[in-house]
Structure formats: structure tokens, C-alpha cells
Amino acid sequence: MEFPSKEILLFKENILNLYKSLKNSYSNNERNLFSHVEDVISSLEDDLDFNIGHKPNIQPVCRFLDVCISETKNNDLKKISETINSLKHFLNWRLNDNYKNVFEDNFFKNESFVEIIGPSGLLICDNIRVGLLLLGDHVLYPSHSHQASEFYTILSGSSMWQINSGNFNLKKPGDKIFHDEWVTHAMNTN
């Protein structure tokens, strides 16, 4: 297979546009999110090298990927889903080894992540990671925390999200979720 240079650059452009639209929708009062958005925009505006040695890999949860892509209805997110579809055979889906002894084995049949832009992504960037988290039906991603701040956009389906010890709240396609470093969070797919 030929390396998907054009598709990767289109994905980068679509993600950059998503983050630029975010920049205008949050106030400076939301300092940590605003700083996160600024860092991602700055990094994506740089020329990034292709990771020619990148090796594709699939996980059991990838059985849901085509459905997730086809169910993306939001016009802005549809562009991202279309580029994901064009890249899907090049993606290196992984399991988080940090949770191997924490979560049940069945969890790993219904969860995986892929880094598209980042230190080991299709496009190399040392200071940010842009990728996908794929969860199957009826999956509880237990409460956890980590050093990385994260920004999620729901592409398809729905999910219940919990931040700290608050209630789970329904998130639908197009909804955006941000949590800062070490903020405890959990999700449960419907």
C-alpha cells in the first residue's frame, strides 16, 4: 500500500479547522482549555514529518469502525470521518498497557485508541497527540486519571460522561468534552 500522504494532510487540515472553530467558542476565562487549544493549533500549523515506518494494526473493537464512520451526521465532523475512512487501513490501533491489570479482559475487546498525529503517529509531532478512541456498545471505561489533558469530540453514537465524582451526563455527536491533567473521568457507551 502506498503511504497516504494526501489523506494525512487532509486529516490534519480538518483537525486544525476544528480547533480554530473552538478557539472562537471559548473565553479566556477557561484558561486551561484555551491554552490547550492554542498549543494544538500552533503545533498543527507547523510542517510535520511523515512517519514512513508506521505499521498498521487492528484490534477487536475495530469491527465497529465502519458503522461509526457511516453514522457521523454532523457536517463539520463528516469531513473528519471521511478522512478517517480513507486512512483506516493505515491506522495502528493499540491497547493501553497501563490498564492491563486494572480493567477486565473483556474491556480490551471493546476499546482501542490510535494516534494519528503525535510521537508515534502517521504525522510526527513531539508535543501533542491527535487520535481516536473507539468504544464498542455498552462499555464502561472506568473512572481514571492521568497526566495528559484531553479534548474529545463525539463523532457518532452517544456516551455518558462523568467528570470527577459528578453525575454521568449524556454526550451526543458534535458534543465536546475537555478535562485537564489528573482530572478523574469515566465514560459509558449506550
Place the predicted regions along the sequence by residue.
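A short, N-terminal "cap"/entry segment at the start of jelly-roll beta-barrel domains
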Residues: 8, 13-125
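Asparagine-centered strand-capping/turn motif at beta-strand->loop junctions
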Residues: 188-190
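Short, basic/aromatic beta-hairpin or loop at an interaction surface
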Residues: 147-159
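Residues that recognize and position ribonucleotide moieties
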Residues: 126-128, 152
